[in-house]
Amino acid sequence: ILTHTCRFGDELEYGKKIFHSIKSDNLLSEFVSDNLQLISTTTRENSSFMGRMTQWLLNGKFESATGKDLSIDTDRVMICGSLEMLKEHKEICLQKGMMEGSNSAPGHFVIEKAFVD
């Protein structure tokens, strides 16, 4: 499941481009089949899917939208975004029993800090 949250709808194009390129790639599309989902939300512009993904994970909207909850048995999470969002997502993952990973010790989630502002 690829989630992408931005302030405004036109900022969501990057996530849509990644999603559609995976779905149209001959090798990757066979691997992901119908399992790949895209959940795009906005935080400032009114849209059919509004709110921060951290809120969605905590209030059940993520599970309602995807039919799944995060599982340490089947899921791996890569988190990228603002410093505050990274902290919030990390705490949610830890509460679900997930362990942070690194290059030398794979875990259930990793944090990408290259884009922290």
Where are each of the predicted segments found?
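Reductase modules of NAD(P)H-dependent flavoproteins
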Residues: 3, 10-117
